[in-house]
Amino acid sequence: MVILKKVNQEKVVYLVNPKAGKLSIKQKKKIISKVNSNKKPDIIFTKTSEESSSLARYYMKRKALVIACGGDGMINLIAQQAIETSSIIGILPFGRGNDFARSLGINSIKKAIENLKGDKVSNCRYLNLEFSNSKKIALTCAGVGLLSEAAYRATKIPLLKGSLLYALSALICFINLKNHCYSLTVNGKTKKHEALILAGAASPYTGGGMFIAPDAARRKNELNLLYAGGLRRLDAIKLLLKVFSGSHIEHPAVKNTHTKNFKVEAASKNRWSSIVSGDGEYLGDLPVQISLGIKP
């Protein structure tokens, strides 16, 4: 997928999630005005994810440049339409986590504005997820277990943002900590695993800056597969703290490998075990086939 960081097309449309992050609508408009100081761009505050996807597709088919303004979830929606229509997008990270932007070296709004005014183009890695009845993408990582439960709980904590938000969410999950049983198929071989977390990654960050996959881009044509299990509560908490630095991948309970694709099926009846999350959002239920996206 291609991210364009220069606003040079005649028609530019900003699709904005009004609820993303802590910025007010007025503040978001002010930031957008700094990108297009000489023009009055089309700014649309969308009300639903369906509207965001529909409008993105509409304008992309008319060769407009769409700027996704929101968190990882909003950017995910716009990016999926860009992939399906072979379009280019820009981003303004207005969310609480902003892990996809971070993976591109965009660590602030100021940096995002500079990039949109510059001439840099990035061809970005992403994941394809194939469920029984739908297809989705993930720009950062996607998985099951603690990752999914923490992402869900994070949406219920309105006052925090970034890694602190997701760390707190994960700690809440430890109250009823469970390793779930999954059937994992890699390279045609299927094995059952008791896992606390299982994820595929296209880029290094998740959870508002957690360095979950330091080796995400090590192999150009493969995604990073990570999973961990068999940990008691205290050991699991210690492992979580190591995720901030990326040193968790050295823990003996963590399996860190690369593959072109893998399939996960639930072997537990617990509802949490089957929920698949990616880019901080619910994407679907197991079973799922996850592969590295190949379409630019």
Which role does the model predict for each range below?
Residues 16-18, 70, 227-229:
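Short beta-strand/turn micro-motifs composed of small residues
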Residues 143, 147, 199-212, 282:
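Glycine-rich phosphate/pyrophosphate-binding beta-alpha loops
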Residues 15, 19, 86-88, 92-200:
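Catalytic core of DAGKc-family lipid kinases
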Residues 2, 25, 186, 192, ...:
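ATP/nucleoside-binding phosphotransfer catalytic cores, i.e., glycine-rich phosphate-binding loops
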Residues 1-66, 76, 80:
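ATP/NTP phosphate-donor binding region
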Residues 158-165, 208-209, 214-235:
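Gly/Ser/Thr-rich active-site loops/lids in small-molecule metabolic enzymes
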Residues 147-150, 192-194, 205-209, 233-236:
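Short acidic/glycine-rich loop or secondary-structure boundary segments that cap or lie
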Residues 73-78, 124:
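Short glycine/serine/threonine-rich phosphate/pyrophosphate-binding segments
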